[in-house]
C-alpha cells in the first residue's frame, strides 16, 4: 500500500526524471524504463500515476507551462511601475525565465512543439499556451495602440519571443537572456512610439 502523501512527491520525481531523460537522449529515446530508473522507482509507478508515457509527457508539459505562468505572474506582481511598457517587459522576462531556458526545458519544449503536430492532446496544450501569450500581449498593447495595431504588435512580439528562444535552443549555446531581453525591449519601444 502506498504511503500517504507520496503521490505529489512521486509525480514530481517522475516529471524531473522525464526532463532529465529528454535532455540527455531526446523524447523518442526517453523510455519508461529509463525514466523510472532515473526517478528510482519501478516502471509500474509511471502507469499508476500517469497511465502511460503520453500521460507523463502531458504532465511534464503542464509542469513547464505552469512554471511559465508563475514566472510571468511573479514579475507582474513585483512591478513598481504599472504601465503597459513595464507589463510587456515583465511578460517577456517571464518567458525568458531560467525555468524555460535551461537545457532540459528547452529540449523538452522543442520535442513538445514537434509532437504537438501529431498529438491532439499536446496540440491543445500548445494552443492554450500560445493564446495566453498572445492575449496577454494584446491586452497590454491595446492600452497604447489602436485595436488592429495592438493585435499586429502582439503577434510580432509573440513571434519574436518564440524566435529568439528557438534560435538559442537550436544553437546549443546557453541562452543569452540579456541579449534576448534587449532585442525584445527594443521591439516594444518601436511599437509603443509609432506615430
From Swiss-Prot:
* Keyword Transferase attributed: no
Q: Which GO terms describe its molecular function?
A: DNA-binding transcription factor activity; transcription cis-regulatory region binding
Q: In which pathway does it act?
A: Amine and polyamine biosynthesis; betaine biosynthesis via choline pathway [regulation]
InterPro entries the record matches: BetI_C (IPR039538), DNA-bd_HTH_TetR-type_CS (IPR023772), Homeodomain-like_sf (IPR009057), HTH-type_TetR-like_transc_reg (IPR050109), HTH_TetR (IPR001647), Tet_transcr_reg_TetR-rel_C_sf (IPR036271), Tscrpt_rep_BetI (IPR017757)
Q: Which UniProt keywords apply?
A: DNA-binding, Repressor, Transcription, Transcription regulation
Q: Which GO terms describe its biological process?
A: glycine betaine biosynthetic process from choline; negative regulation of DNA-templated transcription
Keyword presence, Transcription regulation: yes
Q: Where is the HTH tetR-type domain?
A: 8-68
Residues of the DNA-binding region? 31-50
What PANTHER family does the record tag this protein with?
HTH-TYPE TRANSCRIPTIONAL REGULATOR BETI (PTHR30055:SF234), HTH-TYPE TRANSCRIPTIONAL REGULATOR RUTR (PTHR30055)
Q: What does this protein do?
A: Repressor involved in the biosynthesis of the osmoprotectant glycine betaine. It represses transcription of the choline transporter BetT and the genes of BetAB involved in the synthesis of glycine betaine.
**Record's protein name:** HTH-type transcriptional regulator BetI
Amino acid at each position: 500500500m502506498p504511503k500517504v502523501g507520496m503521490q505529489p512527491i512521486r509525480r514530481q520525481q517522475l516529471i524531473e526524471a522525464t526532463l532529465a531523460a529528454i535532455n540527455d537522449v531526446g523524447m523518442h529515446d526517453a523510455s519508461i524504463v529509463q525514466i523510472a530508473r532515473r526517478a528510482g522507482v519501478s516502471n509500474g509507478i509511471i502507469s499508476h500515476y500517469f497511465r502511460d508515457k503520453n500521460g507523463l509527457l502531458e504532465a511534464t508539459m503542464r509542469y513547464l507551462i505552469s512554471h511559465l505562468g508563475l514566472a510571468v505572474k511573479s514579475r507582474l506582481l513585483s512591478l513598481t511601475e504599472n504601465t503597459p511598457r513595464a507589463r510587456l517587459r515583465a511578460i517577456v522576462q517571464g518567458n525568458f525565465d531560467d525555468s524555460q531556458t535551461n537545457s532540459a526545458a528547452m529540449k523538452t519544449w522543442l520535442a513538445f512543439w514537434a509532437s504537438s503536430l501529431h498529438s491532439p492532446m499536446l496540440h491543445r496544450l500548445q494552443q492554450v499556451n500560445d493564446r495566453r501569450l498572445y492575449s496577454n500581449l494584446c491586452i497590454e498593447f491595446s492600452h497604447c495602440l489602436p485595436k488592429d495595431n495592438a493585435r499586429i504588435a502582439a503577434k510580432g512580439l509573440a513571434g519574436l519571443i518564440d524566435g529568439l528562444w528557438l534560435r538559442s535552443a537550436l544553437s546549443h549555446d546557453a541562452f543569452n537572456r540579456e541579449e534576448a531581453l534587449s532585442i525584445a525591449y527594443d521591439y516594444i519601444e518601436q511599437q509603443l512610439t509609432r506615430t
